[in-house]
């Protein structure tokens, strides 16, 4: 570090141990290329074909196909009603659908929800006596015996 400090303190910014860097005259190639890009000389076709070569043509995945909300013409569209929606309408539609789903729930589902909310566990294991609120949890427990 002493030698480096000597170079800096003397105002000598060159190091004799390092070979001099070759300097090339500045070129306008990069600037010209950037200018032609900004001017829009690049065709949309070449950009799109490059994208397709990299990513391939767009094909929806099975998850996208069954997604409740899909994009069409840059607007949300709900499969059930096929109407273009604004972002606020998407939220309203989702809330409305949730309310309908709640009304359509079966008595059994409501009974299980009530048990969960109250902590009621009327089902018990015949082997150990441990209590459960749903049949499927009891059945899973009984497999451990």
UniProtKB/Swiss-Prot annotation:
One of its GO terms (cellular component) is nucleus. Disulfide bonds: none annotated. Residues 1-25 are annotated as: Disordered. GO terms for molecular function: DNA binding; zinc ion binding. The keyword Transferase does not apply. The keyword Signal does not apply. InterPro entries: Znf_C2H2_sf (IPR036236), Znf_C2H2_type (IPR013087). SUPFAM superfamilies: beta-beta-alpha zinc fingers. It is found in: Nucleus. It comes from the Eukaryota. Keywords: DNA-binding, Metal-binding, Nucleus, Transcription, Transcription regulation, Zinc, Zinc-finger. A zinc finger (C2H2-type) spans 123-145. May be involved in transcriptional regulation. Belongs to the krueppel C2H2-type zinc-finger protein family. This is Oocyte zinc finger protein XlCOF8.4I.
């Amino acid at each position: 570090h002493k030698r480096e400090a000597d170079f800096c303190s003397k105002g000598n910014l060159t190091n004799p141990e390092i070979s001099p860097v070759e300097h090339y005259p500045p070129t306008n190639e990069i600037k010209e290329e950037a200018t032609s890009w900004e001017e829009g000389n690049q065709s949309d076709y070449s950009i799109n074909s490059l994208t397709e070569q990299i990513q391939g043509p767009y094909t929806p995945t099975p998850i996208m196909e069954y997604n409740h909300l899909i994009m069409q013409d840059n607007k949300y569209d709900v499969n059930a009603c096929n109407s273009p929606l604004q972002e606020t309408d998407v939220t309203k539609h989702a809330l409305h659908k949730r309310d309908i789903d709640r009304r359509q729930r079966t008595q059994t589902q409501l009974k299980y929800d009530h048990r969960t909310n109250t902590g009621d566990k009327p089902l018990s294991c015949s082997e150990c006596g441990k209590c459960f609120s749903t049949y499927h949890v009891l059945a899973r427990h009984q497999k451990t015996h």
